[in-house]
């Protein structure tokens, strides 16, 4: 035996590392080669020396260039080369050049490479050794005509195979004559590209066989043994995916016959070194396919079940050792046995749901499995590894070994689940499905297993919550939160969270239990019998909608939920859902409003939950088909809503009937609502909104069967004296409990409530002290003390109320960026009549449009627009119409006259057009006909209830659409959300997929990210907590990307974030020339939702050209005249600023 002192591995990745380890155990120095693309690959560092093979060579050529590799070997003074598998491992010329240079090639002899490197020669060799072979051509088929001739004789199905190589390349199954020609030419072409040899041969295709290979090893002394078989039947396109040793599905007799055949072949040719003899097995028949004259990827599992190191044996055999000598110490064939079973899974960056397309990118997290009976053979599986498109997508080979196949499979599932690989897609979920499939676990699978088992692809995407959370925090840290001033994260006080035990809450029996017991009518009767006034708390909805632009997040409500359940155990209801909270949750807070409802319902089981329902607008800004309203109410009731406050923004009772019917069907409480506007004390203010008007409406609502009558004073216009008169008249006119809602903008709210209570009101809306006043509701805490000594009082726990107020006073500071400009009582409300819930939202809109400094003008314009539109009731969505028009007129310096005179050439906000089309409803005094004509520009207006014109939504079609888009099941809640807000819902899903469940983050981190050195804890599930520390942030690179270094649960993580404030290649957008009528410019900043035309297209006057959106306000840009589109400067999704050129039209000539 000649000792090998220095060994070069002509390969890369995990097999190179495997060989280095074997050599190190034999005290042999090692040399690695690498390409330019592999400079950071792990195998380079696992050798004693490593050398770049040709800086001018491509990624594959570096490992295929024989002369360059030989040069490195000579310079490094190596005396042996191991080729691994793939690349040059079966290349006869490479082995010959090694021999010529006096370098030992660790592999079979040249004649073996020659006979097995060509599949036709291999077949001939097998026939000579008397092995059964698949009927086929005697040699390569030179032309399609000869292929066709053979097919006519042999019949179908057939397999066309490349004579060279392996790995499933150059192979095609042909099942009928029509497929033959294309398959023949494709197989030849693929063979040429893969192996540099286009020769193919044809054989009979064995349908549905097992693929069994036998591991053999021979030495230079004529000794040959087999190490039993491996089952490689789990394949995709003839490439192995999972291997098992030994095969579960073979009988002992058939196993022995196959292994004997393998030995028979190799002894016949005096084979040397490691190789595998491959067979197809069908029933009790088996057929020789080929020999792989090299080490195989799956050699690991044979090593595990036999205890024999195949790679070390290869090296020692090449050095001249005897298999049965003391260096190798191989047992005699009769003494070689297997212990238990082993399974190998190849973990790759392939995406099974995208036709196994290899993914590329940076591995940002890598956590291995391990433990008893687990083996890992890793290549580029490590954190920070750049996965390129140049090489095999294999990251690591995971092998498990156990005494039984079932235990090995269980160990594999555990190990696969334990792996954490982030930054690239992997096939791990697919492999888990393979392991758990009954066909696999029984051993009753064939080479068609993957093809015939579609349930293997029922893959739930990895939650990857840690990485998604880090990416969101990184992005908001670097780029800030939309409409929040970009600044360092403030050092907020941590809110003290009072809690109440779940057992105590479970003991409460409140209005929720009363409803379940006596039903809606029973609750109404109970309310009327109460001496004290009852409370509805609005802190969870209208209070923060009015004060903080609806921005309060679910987490801050959940934190205080148990205490709220305790404090309001004697209250009537908690208003906590509906209105603007629905779309704002999706759109701005990036959380699911249904999840909020269900989580709060679970935490507060004892008090009625109340929502604001915009009648036929549901929680949207337009009318929806009747079946949408029914479905929305049905789903809301199931999720936890008990009281539906139903209103129409124009007080049109016809619009409220469908919603009332739906609520009654659901067995819930229906509040018929009158929206209060004007001033019943001042006849000069309006001859429309009189006391008689409201009494008439109340009687109409009673006739419709509503359970409770609500007065919604959305702007806080109801003065104390007016409240006394109105409530008194209504109590006389109808036999319904009366529920009053107001806003404290003027500072008169408490007195208004006192007068209403004296007049007999049954329920009032208040908020806890720190979330009350101004545009919110009056303070419940203050009202408690104000009513001391009076006959009617509040049933509430005042100490508990103070505790809630302390909590909210701290939490409110987190939302300071969304506070409105009103800092004190403001009697301007009696002039502009803006709803409290709209004030802070409109202020935010104005700021986003660059009108923050002109908000006083916006408020005045709001008043003027109201009278321009005919003095309408102003509450969502009608208030949005007035607000959109006010912003539009201030932005474009318009007044009432210019709207009438120049309106024909103006593109009005979509909500305004919709209003004048009658899509929201009919104002009590009708429309201003002149203004309607200008705004509609010939469009026809509705004259009846919009729902009568709308086709029912086909929910099953929506389900199919969403399931296709989301690649999985969808809920009824998803369906109704999409119907109400398709774009908003889709954007939310996109954000959820990108960043995960953001409602779990604490609010300061959600809005501001993290400071350097800061640590936050995020509970992502029961008993699962992420502890995240932001270590440091790099400077931006040349592309504007920053690297953020975290420690997550003590493990280093890196995330790459594009800094949007770093301009690498400035893209200056052209501006519209105001004097050029052909230039269509952006009238407001925002984004492009949809471009409807293309260059060269002929358009007509008033034809929609594109749709823009700014802060939920859509505008359709129309052609000012007939013409041809000369240029379009924007695309869907582009951000635009006021004055940006969008489209240029060449006017048509007469």
From Swiss-Prot:
Residues 1071-1146 form the Biotinyl-binding domain. One of its GO terms (molecular function) is ATP binding. Its EC number is 6.4.1.1. It is an enzyme of class 6 (ligase). Changing residue 411 to A: Complete loss of catalytic activity. Keywords: ATP-binding, Biotin, Ligase, Manganese, Metal-binding, Nucleotide-binding, Pyruvate. Residues 123-319 form the ATP-grasp domain. Catalyzes a 2-step reaction, involving the ATP-dependent carboxylation of the covalently attached biotin in the first step and the transfer of the carboxyl group to pyruvate in the second. This is Pyruvate carboxylase. It comes from Staphylococcus aureus (strain Mu50 / ATCC 700699). The gene is pycA.
